[in-house]
Curated annotation (Swiss-Prot):
Domain of life: Viruses
Organism: Enterobacteria phage T4
Protein name listed in UniProt: Uncharacterized 10.3 kDa protein in Gp46-Gp47 intergenic region
Length: 87
């Protein structure tokens, strides 16, 4: 994914996902992407920030798309949220 594509599609946008804890309480988590590493106008690594005090990084593969990045972010957020409430 080029940095230009990332800027046009992902940067400055906030996304939302719904998570549930172990007792079924629903929460909406807002998240967004920030470039962490750019090489030759290609995104190599991003940080996913949330309004829930959790952030994480992941590497970008050549075949990643904006949708695949959002899917990975949602999966990580849901995993982190459930782990916090795992008793």
């Amino acid at each position: 994914m080029t940095f230009d594509e990332f800027k046009n599609v992902m940067m400055s946008q906030h996304f939302k996902c719904e998570v549930k804890d172990d007792i079924g309480h629903k929460e909406i988590i807002e998240y967004w992407f920030e470039p962490l590493e750019v090489e030759d106008n290609c995104i190599k690594k991003v940080t996913v920030c949330t309004d829930w005090a959790v952030s994480f990084n992941f590497n970008i593969l050549d075949n990643d798309t904006p949708k695949s990045l959002r899917d990975m972010a949602v999966s990580c957020i849901k995993d982190a949220y459930c782990e916090v409430f795992d008793i």
